[in-house]
From Swiss-Prot:
Belongs to the WD repeat IPI3/WDR18 family. Component of the RIX1 complex required for processing of ITS2 sequences from 35S pre-rRNA. Keywords: Nucleus, Repeat, Ribosome biogenesis, rRNA processing, WD repeat. The keyword rRNA processing applies. One of its GO terms (biological process) is DNA-templated DNA replication. One of its GO terms (cellular component) is nuclear pre-replicative complex. This is Pre-rRNA-processing protein IPI3. It is found in: Nucleus. It comes from the Eukaryota. PANTHER family: WD REPEAT-CONTAINING PROTEIN 18 (PTHR18763:SF0), WD-REPEAT PROTEIN 18 (PTHR18763). The gene is IPI3. The keyword Nucleus applies. InterPro entries: WD40/YVTN_repeat-like_dom_sf, WD40_repeat_dom_sf, WD40_rpt, WDR18/Ipi3/RID3. The lineage of its organism: Eukaryota, Fungi, Dikarya, Ascomycota, Saccharomycotina.
Length: 508
């Protein structure tokens, strides 16, 4: 299993892999706003174009993948944030004026429009809890929780929670990996006010701020370790690692996110090349609210993400390249640049890292070319809810598992495996023969038929023997049962006689 790295900039889009050298370029991909792209059904990439009311669709996987644009979807106005809810088949788009659009992907219907979801432009949209809730962050320094059903069904949906602790625009946020079907976990937000805030989120009460981290510069992005052990914050000077389990002394490790009390910590960066302070000075600094943190990347970071196992950090900078860094050693492993003739393609605006599973079709007898799926055009007018029923377009693919040899014809599969084993079997110490399976296909078929007939005769003979054995067993069991029944009746008679004798003696 490999991991795919997708990043875009002002004039280029690139698709690369984390553990190999494979790389391709997305043609005609131009987007300047952050979080303006999303992956749909782990196969397609939606990119909202800058200064154009248009969404471009790219096919990332399968036999139909290519670098050119697969489909263009016009939208009512220019979008600067996108999010897809795969569980519900919804596409959400946001504008610079704070308007929120909700489309149904299978039909293209515009389900609802929230004109003033935020007072200013929406920066990021995130679907959580398997599509139950939608979280939006805006330049108005607010972060709002919505229920997905309210956004779809109600004309005037009301927010579930509103967080407005930041004093400047929110630039990014991320939820803890422990967040599952229910709304119960931690939320991390970063802002231009040079602060990182951690909230305890629950559906039963308002989000509670449990920790605040202050920095010497504004914050651009945030990512979280896969095991919730550390936070990676991207700033104008690089990426800073904040360990959530902070070592104060040899025998003392403190959890910085205590749910019972809200604390404010000041981040003090460890200077590269300088000696790390001893534990006594660390304890003194911690007592006055200062935390020593290391800087992993030293470039102006605009986007950051972690690998699946949490060992690698992918950071996009202002020059348009992505750097893969090993977190443990703080050593850069490789740099990924856009395939462009320009020296710089602009800052990295979108960065997506997700695992990719390659599907092999080597066992298929016949490989059919499937036409690429086309998404319906996104409507500009809100659908009338009074009808209640709308057309949904779905493409059903033929199940290719039935074409695989073990499932389609198991006997032929066994014969094929036996012939392959015979081909590679060494009959002597020196001589060996190699044959082609395709040349012996006819002989294998005839041999398979003969072996099938002989095997059927053997099966019938063995069944007759088993039936005779079972009949003999039943007869012997019947005789034994009769003998036991006779013995039981004799014993009962003797018992009755003894009882009668004892009764006569007691009467006398």
């Amino acid at each position: 299993m490999d991991e795919q790295v997708i990043f875009t900039s002002n004039t280029a889009g690139t698709v690369a892999t984390l553990h190999s050298l494979e790389q391709s370029s997305l043609r005609q991909c131009q987007t300047e706003s952050k979080f303006s792209s999303c992956v749909v059904k782990q196969k397609y990439l939606f990119v909202a174009q800058s200064r154009k009311a248009l969404i471009q669709v790219y096919d990332l996987h399968g036999s139909n993948k290519r670098e050119s644009v697969e489909q263009r979807l016009p939208v009512p106005e220019v979008l600067q944030a996108l999010e897809c809810v795969d569980e519900d088949g919804l596409l959400l788009g946001a504008t610079d004026s704070g308007k929120l659009y909700i489309w149904q992907l299978a039909s293209g219907n515009l389900l609802n429009v929230k004109p003033m979801a935020h007072y200013q432009g929406i920066v990021k949209i995130k679907s959580i809890c398997h599509g139950k809730y939608i979280v939006t962050a805006g330049s108005d320094s607010r972060l709002i929780f919505w229920q997905t059903m309210d956004l779809v069904q109600k004309d005037e949906p009301k927010p579930l929670f509103i967080i407005h602790d930041h004093s400047l625009p929110v630039t990014d946020f991320i939820f803890s990996n422990t967040l599952g079907h229910s709304l119960d976990g931690k939320l991390y937000t970063v802002s231009k006010d040079m602060s990182l805030r951690c909230y305890q989120v629950s559906v039963d009460h308002e989000p509670t701020c449990i920790a605040t981290f202050t920095f010497p510069s504004s914050l651009n992005c945030v990512s979280l370790d896969t095991a919730d052990r550390a936070i990676y914050v991207g700033t104008d000077t690089g990426v800073i690692q904040i360990p959530l389990y902070y070592k104060v002394s040899n025998s003392k490790i403190i959890n910085l996110l205590q749910p019972n009390e809200s604390k404010i910590y000041s981040i003090t960066e460890i200077t590269p090349g300088a000696m790390e302070p001893d534990l006594s000075s660390r304890e003194k600094l911690f007592s006055i609210g200062q935390i020593l943190c290391a800087r992993i990347v030293h470039n102006n970071t605009t986007s950051v993400a972690t690998s699946l196992d949490g060992s690698l950090l992918v950071s996009g900078d202002s020059t348009g390249k992505c750097t893969v860094t090993e977190i443990f050693s703080n050593q850069p492993l490789k740099e990924i640049r856009a395939l462009s003739t320009n020296d710089s393609t602009g800052p990295v605006s979108n960065l997506i890292v997700f695992p990719v599973t390659q599907q092999s079709e080597s066992l298929l007898d016949v490989t059919k070319i499937v036409k690429p799926w086309k998404f319906p055009n996104l409507q500009r007018a809100i659908v009338d809810r009074k009808h209640g029923i709308n057309d949904v377009y779905v493409q059903f693919h033929e199940n290719s598992v039935h074409n695989v040899l073990p499932v389609s014809d198991f006997d032929s599969y066994l014969d094929t495996v036996a012939s392959e084993e015979h081909i590679f079997h060494q009959t002597g110490s020196i001589n060996s023969t190699v044959n082609r399976v395709g040349q012996t296909k006819a002989s294998m078929t005839a041999t398979a038929k003969e072996s099938k007939v002989s095997s059927d005769d053997d099966i019938y003979k063995s069944k007759d023997k088993q039936i005779a054995q079972l009949n003999g067993t039943v007869a012997s069991l019947t005789d034994a049962y009769k003998e036991l029944r006779k013995m039981h009746e004799d014993l009962m008679k003797e018992h009755q006689q003894l009882l009668s004798k004892n009764g006569t003696q007691t009467e006398n």
